[in-house]
Amino acid sequence: MPMPTEERVSQLVAGLVERRGFDLEGVEITRAGSRADAQPRVTVVVDSDGAADLDAVAELSSEMSVVLDDTDIFGDSPYLLEVTTPGVDRPLTAPRHWRRAQGRKVRITLRPGAEPPDPGGSAGFEARVGVLDGEQIALVLGGKRNPHRVRVPLADIERAVVQVEFSPPGARELELAGGVAPGRPDPGTDRAIAADGAISEETSTAAASDPTEGIEE
């Protein structure tokens, strides 16, 4: 039978994801191998205001597998279900992404024609995410040496991606950002570095052909 669409899978799992306190960030369906008859791999990306732990993601994956099996959208074909939280390289595209990234360093590219927040600045720059206020985001520029806060309309930002940090920000820099989002680790700490390095591996995998398959870490 034909492979179901990503839109159809999204419709089937959206209610469950919301009930479990997550946001559905995306669904991707690929083949788990190079052969044309390789089993489908369904990757579901979820996130929440607090840091999602592996147990919660694993439980959601098990429930999601039941939902997909009950609808029989894959027929008798085995498939691989992978539920994961967003990696740090996933762009910030919605207001909630900015809210959850508060306190983190991001690489920003402005839209053509948008004025850089610092006079004489370029359209591409790094900043620390501050408090989201409606359609504007506070950004802390200048790093540890000269931290200062500016405001930029979200509409002026073409692309923004969180950066992995290996040392903590300056105290004043983080203060101007308003701290970090609740439930998220402080940037540059061992906990944050470990989370950034392992977040794409925090998956719960269930194959319809093998119900004993467990959790990959």
Swiss-Prot record:
Keywords: Cytoplasm, Ribosome biogenesis. It is found in: Cytoplasm. GO terms for cellular component: cytosol. GO terms for biological process: ribosomal small subunit assembly; translation. InterPro entries: Ribosome_maturation_RimP, RimP_C, RimP_N, RimP_N_sf. SUPFAM superfamilies: YhbC-like, N-terminal domain. Gene3D superfamilies: RimP-like superfamily, N-terminal (3.30.300.70). Required for maturation of 30S ribosomal subunits. Belongs to the RimP family. This is Ribosome maturation factor RimP. It comes from Nocardia farcinica (strain IFM 10152). The gene is rimP.
